[in-house]
Amino acid sequence: MEEIKNITDITQSALAELEAITDLKDLEAWRVRYLGKKSLLTGALRNLASLPIEERKAAGAAANEAKAALEAAFLQKEQISKEKQFASRNEGLDITLPGRPWPIGRIHPLTQVTNEVTTIFSSLGFSVVEGPEIEDDYHNFEALNIPEDHPARENMQTFWIDRPNDNGRLDTLLRTHTSPMQVRYMEKNKPPIRIVVPGKVYRYEATDATHIPMFTQVEGLVVDRGISMAHLKGTLMEFCRRFFGANRKVRFRCDYFPFVEPGVEVAVSCTCGGKKECSVCHGSGWLEILGAGMVHPKVLERVGIDSEQYTGFAFGMGLERLPMLRYGIDDIRLFYSNDTRFLRQF
């Protein structure tokens, strides 16, 4: 029968072409030519409609067998071709080698330093407490013996929140130091008191290598009977020894802070050795890390603590300056740059 012979010829020709194919692109073209909607085999099937019924059945069966044979041959060839392609791509791949490690995150250096500082003071008997970052005028200034005409109240140094009180006066702000928590804690707790307060503080300052508008501070407060300047110096010297090591020089100098009397500035020797080009110490050889002093009697009296019976000391340190001194970092802005090349060193 001519139709069956035609189907057989198409099948044999298709299988011969399939055998010679080595590329997946050519294989897809073969599929369209012999198994697609407009394929040669489909064209042969259209001619069966004019045949007598018996011949049509025989030719139809032959066509279905041919199509099944071609589909099976195509799938087999496709599988073999894909395996060969995969093997050629991975010819130089050693699957016994370990995989590439996934990048692991690190704790931010400021978080590390905060944890280390609070751990040191905890071992010295201090409790760790936290306070609000949005403060009121009373706790941030007035209760700490900072009068209304003090420069720190000016808009140029304080971020005031545009929310006037009933008198039309701005009295809500982003805290300029962690010292307000001194007052809040003493309002609710009686001596003996020994606390440290870590947290973010905000000041409207020009940005440079050692100053930024938002930074981290740790406040310390001790109130008890018989507390003296010797206790303050001993505590801070011990902290500096544990954090910086015994070989680092520590300097105490008189300074003024409204909420302490007397006040001192504590500085640590710079890693540069006093070089004039140093952007951290500016050639002085020292970097101030904290201000401290004996708690002013007016501060104690405001919270109902008898300043005749109790004395205390307080200190506040900028945490960013500690790793700057320890690791020789010359720009405080690096801590907030989100540069992973810098951060993954710690």
UniProtKB/Swiss-Prot annotation:
Keyword GTP-binding carried by entry: no
Reaction catalysed by this enzyme: tRNA(Phe) + L-phenylalanine + ATP = L-phenylalanyl-tRNA(Phe) + AMP + diphosphate + H(+)
GO biological processes: phenylalanyl-tRNA aminoacylation
Keyword Magnesium part of the UniProt annotation: yes
Pfam entry (one): tRNA-synt_2d
Positions contributing to Mg(2+) binding: E261
UniProt GO MF annotations: ATP binding; magnesium ion binding; phenylalanine-tRNA ligase activity; tRNA binding
Enzyme class: ligase
Keywords: Aminoacyl-tRNA synthetase, ATP-binding, Cytoplasm, Ligase, Magnesium, Metal-binding, Nucleotide-binding, Protein biosynthesis
Cofactor(s) needed: Mg(2+)
Bilayer-spanning residue ranges: none
Alphabetical list of PANTHER family matching this protein: PHENYLALANINE--TRNA LIGASE, MITOCHONDRIAL (PTHR11538:SF41), PHENYLALANYL-TRNA SYNTHETASE (PTHR11538)
Subunit annotation: Tetramer of two alpha and two beta subunits.
Descriptive protein name: Phenylalanine--tRNA ligase alpha subunit
Organism for this UniProt entry: Dehalococcoides mccartyi (strain ATCC BAA-2100 / JCM 16839 / KCTC 5957 / BAV1)
